[in-house]
Amino acid sequence: ALLALGALGALGVAVAGQARGAGMGGMAGMPGMGGMAGMDMGQSQPTAAAPGVGVFSRALLIPPELHGQPRDGVLHYALRMAPGRSMLVDGLQTATWGYNGAVLGPTLRVPRGKAVQIDLNNALDQSTTLHWHGAHVPGEMDGGPQSLIAPGGQRRVHFTLQQPAGSLWYHPHPDTRTGPHVYAGLGGLFLVDDPADQHLGLPQQYGVDDIPL
C-alpha cells in the first residue's frame, strides 16, 4: 500500500499490508522564491537506497530519520524551514524549500506516550506554519493557519501522543498558501511508533524493507 502525500507528488512509506514527494517545474516565478542562489541547506542529507533492477537511472533517496534527544524526561526535536536548491533533474538546479535541508524534511519518529518538544525556526521570507497532519494534539499545538511563524520567527510546540502506530506527515498550513508552500518542498513523514506494534511481524528496517516513497 502507498500513502500518497502532496509534497512533490508523493511522499509515504510502503510496507507489507499497511501504509507507512516529484515534479517541481515552474517554480522560478513563485512569489517569495527569490534570493536563493548559493544557499546550502545540507544539514539533513538523504541517503540513497541500493538501486535494483529496473529502468530508473537515479537511486531512490531515503530521508534521514530524526529521533528526539532525551532530556529531563522529554524528547527534543528541532526543525528549520529554509530555502535551498535541489537537483531534481540531472544538470538542473531548482529553487526549493525544505526542513533541515534543501527540500522536504527528515522522517520524525515519535514514540506513543512520550512527551515531545519541537522547536521550529522559520528562515523563509514568508510567514508559514507547521501542521501535524493526523496527530491527536491540542488545538493550540496543531499548527493551523492561526499559528503563523513570521520570517525569522520561532515557535515551540509540545505534546504527548496517545494514539496507535501510524503513518502521518507534517506540512505548512498558512491560509491560502498551503499549496504553494508544499509544492516548494515543505513536507515530511511523521511516524508514530508503538511498542504494541512490534509483535505483528511487519517490516521494521527503515530504508531497507520499510521504504519511504
Predicted regions and their residues:
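N-terminal export leaders
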Residues: 1-13
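Histidine-centered copper-binding motifs that mark active-site loops
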Residues: 6-9, 20-213
